[in-house]
Amino acid sequence: QLLADKVRISEPRIKSGSANPSPKLLTVVAGMCAGADSIDDLDLVRGGGMKTLFDGVYAPSTIGTLLREFTFGHARQLESVLREHLAGLCERVDVLPGADGRAYLDIDSLLRPVYGHAKQGASYGHTKISGKQILRKGLAPLITTISTECAAPVITGARLRAGKSNSGKGAARMIAQAVATARAAGVTGQILVRGDSAYGNSTVVAACR
């Protein structure tokens, strides 16, 4: 229901691409739950006994057409779905026990390798493998999580960036949004923000205050 309410493609390049975004995005979620890590892998939810678990799924090519319609604004729409879903889940299940005490907000950037010369947004960034610094082509998502003394971390925000992006780019805004998400999820205690030295700048400190 959140997807149906939040996600809108008002000016599609391909009209069929914007049709029924909610069940198409649910197909992506179902595929990820089943182990898919690419668009082609989403076909696994249409085979074997999967149809007894997932109803009304779409072909990978159809999903790809929808995703190519997405812009940064649509990514923000999905972020709002994530925030409201977490808040709604916490109303029904004790996902964050101990949220009335101290909670921990962690932020970090990752480098996820991608392949192919035409991969949108991919660029070379530094990563460490077996203790050695190397350049690797990929995307650098910025991730925030919230946890407590009694609860494992849950994701409060994720944003894809080019592989060469500085770790601290956009961190202040991500932290502010993560704090708002944590409060909406029922965190009433003190929130301690944790990150490495890449986030030790005045804008991040201002967001934490």
Where are these regions (language model features)?
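Residues that form or flank phosphate/diphosphate-binding pockets in enzymes
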Residues: 169, 202-203
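Short, surface-exposed basic-aromatic patches at helix termini and helix-loop junctions that form
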Residues: 205-209
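Short, hydrophobic/aromatic alpha-helical segments in well-folded domains
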Residues: 174-178, 194, 204
